[in-house]
């Protein structure tokens, strides 16, 4: 089956696993999904991730993170730029999510960056998702 938006599929799988408090989940791997998982790990939204080779495209196993009382670290995920409606921003228009409590993930000419990194580098790009 052909998937029209693999990034939205990844975010939905994370959201669903998080809602039922699963420890881990698996998604078909790609370079951009690995970079998004790396940002989520670096920003403290997931515990870890690993790439598993399966002689096809590979699998990305993501380990979710919860607080000491089993509260969710990720309270929301939203896909912004979709295949039917791409959303681009200039360097001075890079959005803040919940006044800095969340992150915006952007695809730029310098790779996949958070909103903070994009502002520091003075670059805009396609707004992939918001995470808070």
From Swiss-Prot:
What is the originating organism of this protein? Geobacillus kaustophilus (strain HTA426)
Instruction: Give any Gene Ontology cellular component.
Output: ribonucleoprotein complex
The record's listing under PANTHER family reads:
40S RIBOSOMAL PROTEIN S15A
Domain of life of the organism encoding this protein: Bacteria
Which molecular function GO terms apply here?
rRNA binding; structural constituent of ribosome
Q: Per the UniProt entry, what is one GO biological process?
A: translation
Family annotation (SUPFAM superfamilies):
Ribosomal protein S8 (SSF56047)
Entries under Pfam families matching the protein: Ribosomal_S8
UniProt record similarity statement: Belongs to the universal ribosomal protein uS8 family.
**What does this protein do, in the record's words?**
One of the primary rRNA binding proteins, it binds directly to 16S rRNA central domain where it helps coordinate assembly of the platform of the 30S subunit.
What's in the keyword line of the UniProt record? Ribonucleoprotein, Ribosomal protein, RNA-binding, rRNA-binding
What name does UniProt use for this protein? Small ribosomal subunit protein uS8
